[in-house]
């Protein structure tokens, strides 16, 4: 038996996330899978992904497709892990994997592995597999190419554009020959969008008193594609500025996650005459495209044609403050917790 540090949910989030909503505790775990526990793997967690959707799952949800994290239980999210022991025919000791079953703990016993991917290419940072080569990358790829069906020369708007998904949507759109504008919440992030990720333009939404006016300034001819990560008032302003036959990929609504009374969108009627297609999606429905995604992205990473920014905090103990940083927009790029660098 060894000690196993864990981050647990103290209580359901009620309103704004507080660091006291999470707690560090220590338990023990056996380094071998118990007899009779077939089809399981024991893993050492190396990197954990800290994503906004976790905040949604930490509240009481009335959404069958999203399970709430129960108070007293360990947070579970996407992670990169090393297999230490296996009674599952598909996994062997020593293999590196990424997927959605990594506990916010040093070691996790996964009794029913699913949606776990073996890491074959180790010529890139392992942390990329909770970012550009993991769930955020696949989300950007599926949302932009499968949901938005882009055409060369179209105009694209991305919110939370400096985040784990948005920075990739913008780069994919530029690769495809689109005109891309992003919004973010600081001057540093706006500079990053324009000078590192290659967006055509960007603006700080916190400095805009009227989103509708800001969008008309950046898209005088209207918006063809909107990749929505924030929802709320920005979504309403975007609908006002969408072109006929526009497409909206609803990836997230981070502005609404902790509101006791979510904001309504009051102009949905405009979807009809503008013939706008607005579609929500979850990335797990598109994991069958992962090999195709890797074929496109891996060479471009190695050639420097796609870049990715991470915000890595060290140690499991840093996870609560890292999540709080994501909640208030303090992170720059994909927020990752390095539990162990081996």
UniProtKB/Swiss-Prot annotation:
Keyword Oxidoreductase: yes
Physiological role: Monoterpene synthase that catalyzes the specific reduction of the 4,8-double bond of (+)-pulegone to produce both (-)-menthone and (+)-isomenthone in a 70:30 ratio. Unable to utilize either (-)-isopiperitenone or (+)-cis-isopulegone, or to catalyze the reverse reaction with (-)-menthone or (+)-isomenthone. Has an absolute requirement for NADPH.
A GO MF term: (+)-pulegone reductase (NADP+) activity
Name used for this protein in its record: (+)-pulegone reductase
Upregulating conditions: Down-regulated by (+)-menthofuran.
UniProtKB keywords: Cytoplasm, NADP, Oxidoreductase
One Gene Ontology biological process: terpenoid biosynthetic process
Domain of life: Eukaryota
Regulation: Not inhibited by (+)-menthofuran.
Source species: Mentha piperita
Main location (coarse class): cytoplasm
Family matches, as InterPro entries: ADH-like_C, ADH_N_2, GroES-like_sf, MDR_fam, NAD(P)-bd_dom_sf, PKS_ER
Presence of the UniProt keyword Oxidoreductase in the record: yes
Catalytic activities: (2R,5R)-isomenthone + NADP(+) = (R)-pulegone + NADPH + H(+); (1R,4S)-menthone + NADP(+) = (R)-pulegone + NADPH + H(+)
Residues holding NADP(+): 163-166, 189, 205, 229, 251-257, 281-283, 331
PANTHER family xref list: PROSTAGLANDIN REDUCTASE (PTHR43205), PROSTAGLANDIN REDUCTASE 1 (PTHR43205:SF7)
């Amino acid at each position: 038996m060894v000690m196993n540090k864990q981050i647990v949910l103290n209580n359901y989030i009620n309103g704004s996330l507080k660091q006291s909503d999470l707690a560090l505790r220590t338990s023990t775990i056996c380094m071998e899978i118990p007899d009779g526990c077939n089809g399981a793997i024991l893993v050492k967690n190396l990197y954990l992904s800290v994503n906004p959707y976790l905040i949604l799952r930490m509240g009481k949800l009335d959404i069958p497709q999203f399970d709430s994290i129960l108070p007293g239980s360990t947070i579970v999210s996407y992670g990169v892990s090393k297999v230490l022991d296996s009674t599952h025919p598909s996994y062997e000791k020593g293999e590196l994997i990424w997927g959605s079953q990594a506990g916010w703990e040093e070691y996790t016993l996964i009794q029913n592995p699913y949606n776990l991917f073996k890491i074959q290419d180790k010529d890139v940072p392992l942390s990329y597999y909770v970012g550009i080569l993991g769930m955020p990358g696949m989300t950007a790829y599926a949302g932009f190419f499968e949901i938005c069906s882009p055409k060369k020369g179209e105009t694209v708007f991305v919110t939370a554009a400096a985040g784990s998904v948005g920075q990739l949507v913008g780069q994919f759109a530029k690769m495809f020959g689109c005109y891309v504008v992003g919004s973010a919440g600081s001057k540093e992030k706006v500079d990053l969008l324009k000078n590192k990720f290659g967006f055509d333009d960007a603006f700080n939404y916190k400095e805009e008193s009227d989103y509708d006016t800001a969008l008309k300034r950046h898209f005088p001819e209207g918006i063809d594609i909107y990749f929505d990560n924030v929802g709320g008032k920005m979504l309403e302003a975007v609908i006002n500025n969408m072109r006929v036959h526009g497409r909206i990929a609803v990836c997230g609504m981070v502005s609404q996650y902790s509101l006791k009374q979510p904001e309504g969108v009051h102009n949905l009627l405009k979807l009809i005459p503008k013939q706008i297609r607005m579609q929500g999606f979850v990335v797990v429905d598109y994991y069958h495209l992962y090999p195709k995604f890797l074929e496109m992205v891996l060479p471009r990473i190695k050639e420097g044609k796609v870049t990715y920014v991470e915000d890595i905090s060290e140690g499991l103990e840093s996870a609560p403050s890292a999540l709080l940083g994501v909640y208030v927009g303090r992170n720059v790029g994909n927020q990752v917790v390095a539990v162990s660098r081996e």
